C-alpha cells in the first residue's frame, strides 16, 4: 500500500505536511513528557551499578552523560522520521535510552566488576551490538513472511501487557519509594487521568484541547503537585524491620533546587574525550556476546513497536522498507549513542501508546518534541525542570497510554477473520510465552543465556512462541482465510 502523499500543509493525523506551530509544539511536548524520565532512568541505574556515583566523585560525569542521553534521543528520533539513506523508517517513532538492556548490563558488571572500565566495556559492546542490529535490519525483507499480523499482534499485546505494571508503578509514586501507593500519589495520578479523559472526549475532537489532552493533563497534575508541595508537609516516617524509624521526603514533593543548580548551557561530549575521558569504549568478549543477543531481542520489540505505530496511527500495515529502515536506525542509533557515552537508543513503546490513543502521527509535531529533547541536552536547566516532575503525575497518563498498546495488538489480530489457528497462536503465545517470561523465577533453573533472553519480560518468549506456531501451522494445516487473502 502506498504511503501518505506529501503536501505543503497537513493535519496532526497525517505523517507528512506542515501544521501550525501552535499545534505542533504542544503535541510534540506531550511525547517528551511521556518518555523523559524513562529515557534517563536506565543510565542512572547502570552508572550506579558501575560505581559511577556522585559520592565517588563522578558527579560531573553523570551530569554530562544525562545531558548526552537527551541530545542523542532527539537526534536519533529525527533520523528515524526523516531518514538518511536506508537509515530510518520514516515512521512516527520516538527513540530513547532502552531499559531492556538493564539485566544484561548488570550481568556484565557482575563479571567485570565496578569502575569506569566496566562502563567502557558496556559502551564497546553497544557499539558492536548496534552494528549487528543494523545488519539484521538490512536482511529483514526475507524474514518478513514470519511476521504476519497475528504474530506482530501477539508481540504488540505482549509489549502492552509488560508496560501496564510500569504505568501502575508510576501512578503509585515509583518503585521503591517509601510512600508507594499513598493517597497523595494516587490523587495526583487520578487528576491527570480525569483531566486527560475529559479533554479527550468532551471537547472538540479536532481542537487543541483534545489533541493535546495528555500534555495538558500532565501539566495540570504538575501544577497540583506544586500546590501540594506549598501547603502540605514534605516528610513522613517509615518503620524499619528492626523497629527503628527513619524520616523520608514524599515522592510527590517538587524540589526546585535541582533547577536552580543546573547551568543554562552546556555542549555534549564524546566518550573518551574531554569531560567524558573517563568512559572510553573498550571491547571485551564477555560483554559483547550477551549484549549482541539482546540486540536480537530489541529487533523483535522494534518490529512490534513499528507495526503498532503504523497500524494504529496510519490504519495500514508497516511496509518492508519502514521495518528495515526502522531497525537499521535502531541499531546504528545505539552505536551512535555509545560513541557519546550513553546506552542503547531504541524505539519507545510509551510513545507508541500516545499514537495509539490520539492517532496523531504528524512528523512536524514529533520533530518539535525531538528538538525540545536536543534543547534539554544543551540547556540542563530546562531538563531539570522536566526531570523533577513527580512520577505519579506521569503515571496518570501512562496507565491509559500503555493499555492502548494492548488494544492496538488486539486490533492487529482481529482485523481479519479469526480461525482456530489464530486462536491457538494467540493463546499459546500469551499464555505460555508471555506468562513464562513475565513470572519471576520461572526461568531461574535454565542456563544463563536462556534466562537472559527469556527471563524478566514476556515479550521475547511470546514472540518466539507466536513465530514458531505460525510456521508449524503454515506447514501442517490447511490455509486460513488470511493466507488465501
Q: What are the functions of these language-model segments?
A:
Residues 1-19:
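Short, Lys/Arg-rich, polar N-terminal cytosolic tail immediately upstream
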Residues 21, 47-90, 286-363:
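Membrane-embedded helical hairpins/re-entrant loop segments and their flanking transmembrane helices
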Residues 24-193, 381-382, 388, 392, ...:
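Early transmembrane hairpin of solute transport permeases
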Residues 31, 72-80, 129-137, 156-166, ...:
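Hydrophobic core segments of alpha-helical transmembrane domains in multi-pass membrane transport
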Residues 54-58, 108-117, 161-207, 234-274, ...:
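Inter-helical loop and helix-membrane interface segments of multi-pass membrane transporters/permeases
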Residues 476-481:
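Conserved small/polar residues in nucleotide/adenosyl-binding loops
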Amino acid at each position: 500500500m502506498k504511503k501518505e502523499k506529501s503536501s505543503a500543509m497537513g493535519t496532526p493525523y497525517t505523517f507528512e505536511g506542515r501544521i501550525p506551530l501552535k499545534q505542533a509544539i504542544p503535541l510534540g511536548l506531550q511525547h517528551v513528557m511521556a518518555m523523559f524520565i524513562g529515557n534517563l532512568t536506565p543510565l542512572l541505574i547502570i552508572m550506579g551499578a558501575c560505581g559511577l556515583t556522585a559520592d565517588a566523585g563522578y558527579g560531573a560525569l553523570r551530569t554530562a552523560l544525562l545531558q548526552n542521553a537527551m541530545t542523542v534521543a532527539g537526534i536519533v528520533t529525527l533520523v528515524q522520521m526523516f531518514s538518511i539513506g536506508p537509515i530510518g523508517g520514516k515512521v512516527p517513532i520516538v527513540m530513547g535510552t532502552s531499559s531492556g538492556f538493564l539485566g544484561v548490563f548488570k550481568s556484565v558488571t557482575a563479571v567485570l566488576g565496578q569502575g569506569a572500565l566496566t562502563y567502557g566495556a558496556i559502551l564497546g559492546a553497544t557499539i558492536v551490538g548496534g552494528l549487528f542490529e543494523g545488519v539484521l535490519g538490512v536482511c529483514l525483507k526475507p524474514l518478513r513472511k514470519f511476521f504476519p499480523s497475528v504474530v506482530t499482534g501477539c508481540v504488540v499485546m505482549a509489549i502492552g501487557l509488560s508496560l501496564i505494571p510500569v504505568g501502575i508503578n508510576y501512578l503509585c509514586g515509583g518503585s521503591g519509594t517509601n510512600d508507594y501507593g499513598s493517597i497523595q500519589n494516587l490523587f495526583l495520578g487520578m487528576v491527570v487521568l480525569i483531566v486527560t479523559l475529559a479533554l479527550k472526549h468532551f471537547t472538540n475532537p479536532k481542537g487543541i484541547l483534545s489533541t493535546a489532552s495528555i500534555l495538558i493533563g500532565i501539566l495540570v497534575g504538575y501544577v497540583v503537585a506544586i500546590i501540594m508541595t506549598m501547603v502540605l508537609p514534605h516528610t513522613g516516617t517509615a518503620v524499619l524491620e528492626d523497629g527503628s524509624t527513619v524520616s523520608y521526603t514524599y515522592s510527590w514533593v517538587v524540589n526546585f533546587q535541582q533547577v536552580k543548580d543546573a547551568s543554562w548551557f552546556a555542549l555534549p561530549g564524546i566518550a573518551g574525550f574531554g569531560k567524558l575521558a573517563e568512559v572510553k569504549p573498550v571491547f571485551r568478549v564477555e560483554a559483547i556476546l550477551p549484549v549482541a543477543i539482546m540486540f536480537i531481542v530489541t529487533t523483535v520489540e522494534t518490529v512490534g513497536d513499528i507495526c503498532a505505530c503504523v497500524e494504529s496511527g496510519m490504519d495500514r500495515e508497516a511496509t518492508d522498507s519502514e521495518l528495515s529502515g526502522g531497525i537499521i536506525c535502531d541499531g546504528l542509533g545505539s552505536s551512535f549513542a555509545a560513541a557519546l557515552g550513553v546506552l542503547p537508543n531504541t524505539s519507545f513503546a510509551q510513545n507508541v501508546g500516545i499514537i495509539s490513543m490520539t492517532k496523531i502521527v504528524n512528523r512536524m509535531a514529533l520533530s518539535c518534541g525531538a528538538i525540545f529533547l536536543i534543547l534539554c541536552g544543551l540547556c540542563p536547566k530546562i531538563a531539570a525542570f522536566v526531570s523533577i516532575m513527580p512520577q505519579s503525575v506521569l503515571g496518570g497518563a501512562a496507565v491509559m497510554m500503555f493499555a492502548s498498546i494492548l488494544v492496538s495488538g488486539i486490533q492487529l489480530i482481529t482485523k481479519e477473520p479469526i480461525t482456530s489457528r489464530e486462536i491457538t497462536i494467540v493463546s499459546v503465545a500469551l499464555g505460555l510465552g508471555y506468562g513464562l517470561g513475565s513470572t519471576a523465577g520461572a526461568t531461574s533453573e535454565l542456563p544463563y543465556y536462556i534466562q537472559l533472553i527469556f527471563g524478566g519480560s514476556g515479550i521475547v518468549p511470546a514472540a518466539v512462541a507466536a513465530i514458531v506456531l505460525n510456521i508449524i501451522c503454515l506447514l501442517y494445516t490447511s490455509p486460513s482465510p488470511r493466507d488465501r487473502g
